[in-house]
A protein has these predicted regions:
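Non-catalytic propeptide/linker segments at domain boundaries
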Residues: 4-22
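A short, basic/flexible loop-to-alpha-helix module at the beginning of a structural domain
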Residues: 22-29
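Acidic, glycine-anchored loop motifs typical of Ca2+
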Residues: 32-33
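Residues at the starts of beta-strands that form the adenosine-phosphate
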Residues: 36, 65, 183-185
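Conserved SGNH/GDSL esterase-like catalytic core that processes O-acyl groups on lipids
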Residues: 38-39, 44-161
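Alpha-helical cap/lid subdomain in secreted, periplasmic
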Residues: 110-242
Length: 242
C-alpha cells in the first residue's frame, strides 16, 4: 500500500521539469475543445493496448483522445545515420516514425510492419494513419531501457544531433516536431528503474551496471538535459516511481 510509505525516508530529488506552453505559439490556432494526445515510444505503450494500458490510463485520467503509436522494442536512436534498406526496423524508431507523420506518408512503414510476425507493428501503423496532426495538442515520448540495453551510445559529444545516439535521436526528432508543429506541447517521459539481463539470464542493477556507455541513470540525466535544451517538459519515472 503506497499510502503507508513515508517518502521522507528517501533522499532523492526527481528531475521533473514542467515547462509552460508559450502562448505565442498558439496564435491563430483554433481550439476544437478537445485535448488530443499522441503517444510515441516503445514497450510502455505497446505492451498493453487494452483498457489497462498506459495510453488508455492517460486517456481516462485526462479525459483526452489518445493515439497509441508505440512500436515494440523500438528505440529513441536509429541504428544507422542514414536509412539502410538492409535494416528495415529503423523505420519503427523515433526519428523515422515522426518523419512518417511529417511527410504524411505511411506506405513504406506499412509494408515493413506487415512483414513482421508480431501483429502489433501493423496495428500501430493503422493507428498512425488515423491521426490528424492538425488536431494533436500534446505529444508524449516514452522509451524504456532499450537504448541502454542495446549499448546505444548515450550521446555523441562531437555531434549532438547524431541520430544513432540516444540523445541525438531524441534531440533531432524533438526539433523536427517543434519546427513542423510549433503549437504541439511535448512531454518526454523517462524510463522507469530497470535491470539488465545478460546472456546467462543473470540480472544486473541498471543504476550501477555500465553497459559501455554509462549506467541507466546516466541515460536518464542525458535525457533530461535534452528536454531542457529543447525547452520541453520532462517527467522523471526513474526516481519518481517506487
Amino acid at each position: 500500500n503506497t499510502d503507508e510509505i513515508d517518502t521522507s525516508q528517501f533522499d532523492i530529488e526527481t528531475l521533473d521539469m514542467i515547462i509552460p506552453m508559450d502562448s505565442s505559439l498558439l496564435a491563430g490556432r483554433e481550439d476544437d475543445g478537445e485535448t488530443t494526445i499522441l503517444c510515441l515510444g516503445n514497450n510502455p505503450f505497446s505492451d498493453d493496448r487494452g483498457s489497462t494500458g498506459l495510453a488508455a490510463q492517460i486517456a481516462s485520467k485526462t479525459n483526452s483522445t489518445v493515439y497509441d503509436c508505440g512500436f515494440p522494442d523500438s528505440s529513441a536512436a536509429c541504428k544507422y545515420p542514414i536509412y539502410n534498406p538492409e535494416y528495415t526496423k529503423d523505420h519503427f524508431n523515433l526519428f523515422y516514425v515522426v518523419e512518417c507523420f511529417r511527410n504524411n506518408e505511411f506506405t513504406a512503414i506499412s509494408s515493413i510492419a506487415n512483414d513482421e510476425a508480431d501483429p502489433r507493428y501493423a496495428e500501430t501503423v493503422e493507428v498512425m494513419k488515423t491521426v490528424d496532426m492538425n488536431k494533436v495538442d500534446i505529444i508524449i515520448i516514452m522509451y524504456d531501457s532499450t537504448d541502454y540495453n542495446m549499448g546505444t551510445p548515450s550521446d555523441n559529444p562531437d555531434n549532438p544531433n547524431d541520430v544513432t545516439a540516444f540523445t541525438g535521436g531524441l534531440r533531432t526528432t524533438i526539433e523536427n516536431i517543434k519546427s513542423t508543429w510549433p503549437y504541439i506541447r511535448i512531454f518526454v517521459m523517462s524510463p522507469t528503474y530497470a535491470r539488465y539481463m545478460d546472456e546467462n539470464g543473470d540480472l544486473h542493477n541498471g543504476t550501477t551496471t555500465d553497459m559501455g556507455n554509462g549506467t541507466l541513470n546516466h541515460y536518464l540525466v542525458k535525457e533530461s538535459d535534452v528536454a531542457m535544451d529543447c525547452g520541453v517538459s520532462f517527467i522523471d519515472n526513474y526516481f519518481g516511481t517506487i
